[in-house]
Amino acid sequence: MAKIPVLEIFGPTIQGEGRVIGRKTMFVRTAGCDYRCSWCDSSFTWDGSMKDEIQMMTAEEIYDRLYEIGGDCFNHVTISGGNPALIKGIQDLVDLFEEKNIESALETQGSRFQPWMRQINDLTISPKPPSSGMKPNIQILDEVIEQCVKETLNLKVVVFDDDDYEFAKYIHHRYPDLPFYLQVGNPYLDDEVENHTARLLERYENLVDKVMQTNDMNQVYVLPQLHTLLWSNMKGV
């Protein structure tokens, strides 16, 4: 059985982003990413700062750890990163979740497709906007989206500034039939941030106001990062 590089397993908690925001879930955070986003809130998955914490685990070992800390208080697991779509071996984990009647969620930037992504119940593709410093390959994004199951797929773009908002409009209009979520960016990544919740809510209100004043984003959902409103930048929640 293939082994998966794991940095964190935690929960139960709530999903803080996207279509399943508020959903009770467990988290499995994998190591490794093919992007280097300037504002990444989980850069420890790829910058080497926690390389000594990586555990190579089989699907069975991951499930056993989930059950050890979550007991029977969950039936949904979010696979996070980094970019889990780099890891072919997650196939074993997704198969095991299906066997155990556990629903799964995944977020990826859409730079890589894996066949097991077709088995994910809540699949979020989140192309990275200009503020990230990354430039998505739109042709590859088209190919990845084409191979996914449309009924389980949604798109999300994080917005920090006007350029990001224009990018979000471009993505939404390129794939108009897919559910689309705008998420306000969190530029305050220190462990302790004064008035963090109030500052994030102000940014969220500004994004909401922007969407309300245009007629070409009538079908979008505008969301905050719910977990940052509750717990700021705390890890493991």
List each language-model region with its residue ranges.
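Short, mixed-charge, low-aromatic patches
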Residues: E17-R23, G48, N121-I125, V159
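A short, flexible beta-alpha/helix-coil linker loop
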Residues: P12, T45-D47, P187-L189
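Conserved residues at beta->alpha junctions
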Residues: A31, G81, V159
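Conserved Radical SAM active-site core
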Residues: L7-E8, K24, R36-N121
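Short linear functional motifs in flexible/disordered or boundary regions
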Residues: G18, C40, S49-D52, F167, ...
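Flexible, acidic/Gly-rich N-terminal and inter-domain linker regions that tether
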Residues: M1-A31, Y35-S43, T214-N215, Y221
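Conserved beta-strand segments that form the floor/walls of ligand-binding pockets within enzyme
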Residues: P5, F27-R29, D41, T78, ...
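Conserved AdoMet/S-adenosylmethionine-binding subsite of the radical SAM
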Residues: C73-N75, A85-V237
